[in-house]
């Protein structure tokens, strides 16, 4: 099952904007790792509701510029309201034809690369729009680290029991075919980019209750989280997952952590 863009909604977009602190903080660390500075021209691919894009705009200052693109119309609508002075457009990583060759100092893809269907094509487009010496920064979820996160640890046992075990094909989830770190490195190098830095990252956020965790995961996946679940089971699964997350609740809420990779590549 491939990633679908058709299941997003204004409710999911608004929920994501409200609950996406961990992605926002991870994105800021990525921008710092990329050494984006005043005067840079930056393309934020998969900008979502524009929180990171707005922060980048403040970092590059009036002498620089930033453009945000995202394939999800509802999220671009929120971004345009958030920062009217920034250019936000509906667009996908695989097609950056709206931008001239060698027109950006940096391209940022924070928490989006794992959702991109054609990664080699996207990287080729990124390389085309980067100036010589320009940087690509990516945070992503490699397949071998997904099992270390809270969501997988909680969802696995719930989906492994009846009635879900008999009717839910976990291999159909879009992220089940994520690239491994080794495959990510190979794909980047094959694109002609030079890998400069790669590190393991941890993101963490406390949620008030189990329902909020389910909302967070569903909005972060723009409706893809439960796509592989038969429709007649989704309501009960949401309840069961919320209860399982609630069992992890401590004095400060429910800690939700995930582990991924952050890397910077350069166009030589």
Regions found by a protein language model. Give the residues of each.
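A short acidic, Gly/Pro-enriched loop at the edge of an enzyme's catalytic core
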Residues: 97-107
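Short glycine-dipeptide loop
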Residues: 62-63, 130-135
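A short SAM/SAH-binding and catalytic strip from SAM-dependent methyltransferases
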Residues: 106-119, 142
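Conserved catalytic/acceptor-binding region of the Class I
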Residues: 120, 135-208
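Conserved Class I S-adenosyl-L-methionine
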Residues: 5, 22-23, 49-51, 173-268
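Class I SAM-dependent methyltransferase SAM/SAH-binding core
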Residues: 43-45, 49-96
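Conserved class I S-adenosyl-L-methionine
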Residues: 1-40, 51-55, 75-78, 92
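Short, conserved SAM-binding segment of the class I
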Residues: 121-125
